[in-house]
From Swiss-Prot:
Protein name: Lantibiotic macedovicin
Disulfide bonds: C46-C54
Top-level lineage group: Bacteria
Keyword Secreted: yes
Organism field: Streptococcus macedonicus (strain ACA-DC 198)
InterPro entries: Lantibiotic_typ-A_Lactobact
Length: 58
């Protein structure tokens, strides 16, 4: 049994497109990222008819 101080590593297979979407490298992203198009941007989730990722480059 693992205690709270032990680290866990999870590996999941994703496509290049899914990875780019996650990190925001090509378009929008779901997590804090440093990208060529928008450095130091924290992505946010926007509500609408469909939940989408939004990047604010301001």
């Amino acid at each position: 049994m693992m205690n709270a101080t032990e680290n866990q590593i999870f590996v999941e297979t994703v496509s290049d497109q899914e990875l780019e979407m996650l990190i925001g490298g090509a378009d929008r992203g779901w997590i804090k990222t440093l990208t060529k198009d928008c450095p130091n941007v924290i992505s946010s989730i926007c509500a609408g008819t469909i939940i989408t990722a939004c990047k604010n480059c301001a």
